[in-house]
């Protein structure tokens, strides 16, 4: 759930990484209690730098959300979608997609295009892709803690997005108020993704995840709703 979208179809070959680089990220993952299902990394198809950046993103969230420490169980680079940068589920797993397969040059070029077009938040970089996915992991944890089902996508995020929006504009009547959509779309186009979302006007879990990456990259220069979501998410996590 929560695939991080990418819209270019460019590819790129890699040179085989040195075994020492692989050993370093493997040691770091082991220290963090994370299983690496990245066999292709050893075959030169996955850049160890990407794995290291993923681990750094996880540690960033652990630092700011201590309740998440140890929640990520594995990183998988073998079964991730080739149509999204990455994805996350409610089972403590993170999956590499395009993020693990594109060359560094092609990944940077694609990401810059996504940012210029407004598809992803301004000021963000490819290295923060898994910050977005950790936003989904936080929601999964809160869903499980508060409602008994990690996979109830939208349950927690809809509440957080609405509370955050009302901090900005107390006159907002509900999640379907056009003013909420306007605030969310100011973060990015992906923050108001349409799709399978049941009772929600859009995929509000993507609003939350995009806000997490926006704030982690831009701090108090992030969009107003991103700042409010980050603050509300931290408040909720401290319950």
How would you label these PLM feature ranges?
Residues 1-13, 209:
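Non-Sec secretion/translocation targeting segments of pathogen effectors
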């Amino acid at each position: 759930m929560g695939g991080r979208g990418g819209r270019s179809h460019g590819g790129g070959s890699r040179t085989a990484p040195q075994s020492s680089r692989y050993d370093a990220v493997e040691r770091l993952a082991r220290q963090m209690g994370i299983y690496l299902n990245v066999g292709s990394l050893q075959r030169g198809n996955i850049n160890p730098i990407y794995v290291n950046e993923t681990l750094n993103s996880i540690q960033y969230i652990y630092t700011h959300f201590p309740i998440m420490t140890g929640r990520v169980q594995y990183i998988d680079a073998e079964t991730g979608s080739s149509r999204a940068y990455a994805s996350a589920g409610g089972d403590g797993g993170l999956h590499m997609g395009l993020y693990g397969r594109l060359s560094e040059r092609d990944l940077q070029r694609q990401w810059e295009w996504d940012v210029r077009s407004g598809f992803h938040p301004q000021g963000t970089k490819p290295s923060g892709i898994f910050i977005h996915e950790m936003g989904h992991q936080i929601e999964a944890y809160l869903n499980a803690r508060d409602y008994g089902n990690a996979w109830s996508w939208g349950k927690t995020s809809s509440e957080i997005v609405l509370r955050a929006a009302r901090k900005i504009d107390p006159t907002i009547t509900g999640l379907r108020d056009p003013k909420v959509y306007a605030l969310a779309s100011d973060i990015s186009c992906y923050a108001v993704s349409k799709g399978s979302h049941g009772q929600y006007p859009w995929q509000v879990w993507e609003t939350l995840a995009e806000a997490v990456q926006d704030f982690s990259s831009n701090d108090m220069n992030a969009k107003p709703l991103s700042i409010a979501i980050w603050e509300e998410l931290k408040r909720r996590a401290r319950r």
